[in-house]
Every structure is written in C-alpha cells, then in structure tokens.
Amino acid sequence: KERAMHVGRKKGQIVDTVVQEQRPSVLLELGAYCGYSAVRMARLLLPSARLLTIELNPDNAAIAQQVVDFAGLQDRVTVVVGASQDIIPQLKKKYDVDTLDMVFLDHWKDRYLPDTLLLEECGLLRKGTVLLADNVICPGAPDFLAHVRGCGRFECTHFSSYLEYSQMVDGLEKAVYKGPGSPAQP
C-alpha cells in the first residue's frame, strides 16, 4: 500500500507553529520529497530568510524544484540534490551557512541520529537551534530519540499526532540545542 510521504495537514500545523515561533533566518530541511513541507515552511519565512532542502532522489528533487518555482518561492528555497551525509559538511563553504536556526528532519529515519551528530560535528548547530523531527514513532527513530532526550545537549518536546492520512500513532520531536558542553540532566 502506497501513501503520500509528506508531512500532511495535522502535523503541518505543528511545523507551522514551530517555524512561526522560531522565525529562522537559515532553515535546513533533510528530505524534500515533492517540496510540500519546503513550501509550507518557506511561506512563513521572512523575505530575507532562506531554506535549503536536501533530497537524495534526483526525480523527487526535480519535482520539489517545480513545486517551489510554482509557489514563487525560488528566491528563498534552494533544492540540493545529494546524500545528507555528503552535503552537510559542504554547507559552510559551498552554501555560505554559518549556523542553522532550524533543521526539519524528514528523510530516512536511520539517518536522523548520524546526521544530527554530523551537524554538531560540523559546527552548524548553535545554542537555540531547533531540530524538528517527523515520524519519530512511525516508522520511528528510536536511536535519535534516545540521543536527543538523553545526551543533555537538547531540551526536548514531543508532539503526538498521527501518520499522514491514517490513524497510526506518530509524532514529531522538537529538540532545542543547548550547546556542546551542556551536562546531562539527572
């Protein structure tokens, strides 16, 4: 059974709220798919802000670019084709990113933790950077959840919801980076 893999309306409202609260100047999305969430988030950004969205599948990236162009948001959104683990280390030099204000994780769930660690290792997270991860319950990202909730460097909030267009329990995890030296809380 196939399903639409975008964030959907209900979880999209949670994403909207987080973007509106954070007001990011530089937002990174991991997993563009068809461009739905990129457009959804970019429409809420200030005109001077930018969103970079990384998509592994070139066909999906081409569709995402068309959707972004159709929405008139091509000045704010850059669609980057490639593997997240290859692109993240290039963000500072090739894409002129100092640090990220927000990261929306919605790609391969087994990449959530390695990419979070890579973002930190590359110096792209700053105190206050918000990670917002979709589908942390279904299909799930247990290693990511264990890390952000247990390492002491993130302040976490869970938003319960349902998998897009179904009644399967799912959720988003908001993890606010406290800095590299934050001690674990007992």
Swiss-Prot record:
Membrane topology: Single-pass type II membrane protein
SUPFAM superfamilies from the UniProt entry: S-adenosyl-L-methionine-dependent methyltransferases
A Gene Ontology term for the protein's cellular component: cytosol
UniProt-annotated binding residues for substrate: K109, N135, E164
Residues that, per the record, bind S-adenosyl-L-methionine: V7, E29, S37, E55, L56, G82, A83, S84, Q85, D106
Binding site for Mg(2+): D106, D134, N135
GO terms classed as biological process: catecholamine catabolic process; developmental process; dopamine metabolic process; lipid metabolic process; methylation
Coarse class of the protein's main subcellular location: cytoplasm
Cofactor: Mg(2+)
Keywords: Catecholamine metabolism, Cell membrane, Cytoplasm, Lipid metabolism, Magnesium, Membrane, Metal-binding, Methyltransferase, Neurotransmitter degradation, Phosphoprotein, S-adenosyl-L-methionine, Transferase
CDD domains associated with the record: AdoMet_MTases (cd02440)
Location(s), subcellular: Cytoplasm; Cell membrane
EC top class named in words: transferase
Bound cofactor: record note: Binds 1 Mg(2+) ion per subunit.
Pfam families: Methyltransf_3
Source domain of life: Eukaryota
MF terms (GO), sorted A to Z: catechol O-methyltransferase activity; magnesium ion binding
EC annotation from Swiss-Prot or TrEMBL: 2.1.1.6
Phosphoserine modification, residue list: S182
Catalysed conversion reaction: a catechol + S-adenosyl-L-methionine = a guaiacol + S-adenosyl-L-homocysteine + H(+); 2-hydroxyestrone + S-adenosyl-L-methionine = 2-hydroxy-3-methoxy-estrone + S-adenosyl-L-homocysteine + H(+); 4-hydroxyestrone + S-adenosyl-L-methionine = 4-methoxyestrone + S-adenosyl-L-homocysteine + H(+); 2-hydroxyestrone + S-adenosyl-L-methionine = 2-methoxyestrone + S-adenosyl-L-homocysteine + H(+)
Role: Catalyzes the O-methylation, and thereby the inactivation, of catecholamine neurotransmitters and catechol hormones. Also shortens the biological half-lives of certain neuroactive drugs, like L-DOPA, alpha-methyl DOPA and isoproterenol.
Family of the protein in this entry: Belongs to the class I-like SAM-binding methyltransferase superfamily. Cation-dependent O-methyltransferase family.
The protein, known as: Catechol O-methyltransferase
Organism, scientific name: Sus scrofa
